[in-house]
């Protein structure tokens, strides 16, 4: 992320390798958070402390974080729930880049995990895009299953959804 103050930041998912695998166990969950560290472009390396800034929602397995800034808020978008039919796009925000981040009141910006008959399924990942005329869109991955079956023969496809901001900044 390239902040408007000139600083640059690296975000990544932290994986708990003590865990027995995807989904983990209550004692040692596989997912251990989204971490943030500053990047020094002159030195060409990460510098300073690594900070765990986002635990995700109870849906779990958060990955693919991106940050963008709007009206003094840092918004983090991430994928949750794996890449199958529980896939979802989660949003959180903070006034400071290193958190704390609060989850969107509805948790998910985009998902069809609870709508098994929706024509677009497996929505997740993605990035916010602002057009030159000030409109916002969220690009994301998804799949279109064949009618009556849960097979998406075209695999993961790209989709785009228009975003409308509320008065509360969500």
PLM region spans:
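Carbohydrate-active catalytic/glycan-binding domains of CAZyme proteins
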Residues: 1-170
């Amino acid at each position: 992320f390239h902040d408007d103050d000139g600083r640059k930041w690296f975000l990544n998912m932290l994986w708990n390798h003590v865990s027995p695998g995807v989904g983990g166990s209550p004692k040692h969950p596989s997912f251990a958070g989204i971490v943030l560290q500053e990047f020094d472009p002159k030195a060409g390396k990460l510098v300073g402390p690594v900070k765990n800034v986002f635990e995700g929602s109870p849906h779990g397995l958060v990955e693919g974080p991106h940050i963008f800034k709007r009206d003094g808020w840092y918004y983090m978008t991430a994928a949750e729930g794996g890449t199958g039919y529980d896939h979802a796009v989660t949003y959180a925000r903070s006034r400071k880049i290193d958190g704390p981040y609060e989850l969107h009141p509805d948790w998910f910006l985009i998902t069809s995990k609870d709508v098994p008959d929706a024509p677009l399924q497996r929505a997740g990942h993605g990035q916010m895009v602002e057009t030159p005329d000030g409109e916002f869109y969220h690009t994301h991955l998804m799949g279109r299953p064949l009618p009556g079956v849960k097979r998406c023969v075209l695999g993961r496809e790209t989709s785009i959804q228009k975003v409308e901001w509320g008065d509360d900044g969500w």
